[in-house]
């Protein structure tokens, strides 16, 4: 981990100055979005608002992992607002820290007035110091930290949706179109569901997929919370591909307003030749477009994962790069990190019994965030 000292609002001098001037952020206290009437309406009033800013996602993270919501909000006389989502992760393994947001690829601050969001950033830092946080990590809003080095960087991809399915299909790479047609000709069918039973089907495939990638699966409690707080509110769905009544691929999608998100995907490697994952994505694209979505976000991709990057680009996606920013509150410095998606542990989880892998995942994910 490398450290950088950057002049500005989060610099060593800035930290000292704000500590001696608490009135700079007087009256700004963190809130739980579930306790704020009309929170989701505030989120949707912002062009960049997404489900990850919503009460549903906050309840999901709090319910699954016991995280503490510490969101900051300020309003303006003209009705404009600035919103800064944060969660406190309190771990005896990795320490106490703030993340915007855990288990989330991107969740940028929402604002129209730069002065307002800077005030919220300062309030969050002072709150973090009062709580003994080691650090604060922002997964979005890179423009607010000019001159700061990124702690991590990833690719992101988004697909433009429209009602004309033929036009969308024509934008797909030829290999993707062939895969979809092959799945359809092979008798692969796709069902859309918001049920707990469908989530259990997905989770079984998810455990297989995580083993293939050499990673422990997330605890089922997390996906049960997604069902309880998101799917039951019609804010998402599960698409399941089956062949001869056997599930071979499944994915979890979210949608709030015009923004849809591909959040999790899983498949049975033994049936990869049937291209279930491709037809699942295609049916999800059509479903979200019919339900008013204008974009489908495909999540983050590690810079070194060329295979996943090619898969996402094959859907006619627009590629961008997202940079996270992490600030060490103990030393008043920005820090850089290494993407640790791959490592020696992948070989271990490739061979561990599934029961043991699930147990490890249930313990570790609460601390890793």
Name each model feature, range by range.
Residues 109, 172, 325:
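Short clusters of hydrophobic/aromatic residues that line enzyme substrate/ligand-binding pockets
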């Amino acid at each position: 981990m490398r450290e950088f000292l950057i002049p500005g609002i989060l610099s060593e001098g800035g930290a000292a100055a704000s500590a001696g001037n608490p009135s700079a952020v007087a009256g700004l206290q963190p809130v739980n979005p579930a306790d704020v009437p009309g929170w989701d309406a505030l989120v949707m009033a912002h062009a960049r608002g997404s489900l990850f800013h919503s009460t549903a996602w906050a309840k999901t993270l709090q319910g699954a992992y016991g995280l503490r919501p510490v969101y900051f909000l300020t309003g303006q006389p003209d009705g404009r607002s600035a919103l800064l989502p944060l969660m406190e992760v309190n771990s005896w393994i990795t320490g106490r820290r703030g993340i915007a947001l855990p288990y989330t690829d991107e969740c940028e601050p929402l604002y129209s007035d730069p002065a307002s969001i800077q005030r919220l950033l300062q309030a969050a830092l002072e709150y973090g110091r009062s709580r003994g946080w080691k650090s604060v990590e922002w997964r979005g809003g890179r423009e607010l930290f000019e001159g700061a080095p990124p702690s991590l960087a990833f690719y992101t991809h988004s697909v433009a949706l429209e009602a004309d399915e033929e036009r969308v299909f024509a934008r797909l790479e030829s290999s993707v179109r062939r895969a979809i047609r092959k799945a359809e000709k092979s008798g692969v069918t796709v069902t859309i569901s918001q049920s707990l039973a469908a989530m259990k089907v997905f989770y079984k495939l998810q455990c297989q997929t995580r083993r293939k990638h050499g990673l422990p699966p997330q605890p089922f409690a997390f996906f049960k919370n997604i069902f309880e707080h998101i799917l039951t509110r019609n804010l998402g769905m599960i698409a399941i591909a089956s062949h001869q009544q056997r599930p071979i691929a499944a994915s979890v999608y979210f949608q709030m307003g015009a923004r849809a998100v591909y959040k999790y995907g899983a498949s049975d490697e033994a049936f990869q030749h049937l291209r279930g994952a491709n037809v699942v994505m295609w049916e999800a694209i059509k479903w979200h477009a019919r339900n008013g979505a204008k974009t489908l976000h495909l999540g983050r991709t590690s810079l070194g994962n060329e295979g996943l990057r090619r898969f996402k680009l094959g859907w006619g996606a627009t590629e961008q790069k997202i940079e996270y920013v992490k600030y060490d509150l103990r030393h008043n410095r920005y820090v850089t990190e290494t993407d640790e998606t791959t490592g020696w542990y992948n070989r271990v989880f490739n061979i561990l019994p599934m029961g043991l892998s699930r147990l490890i995942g249930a313990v570790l994910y609460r601390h890793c965030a």
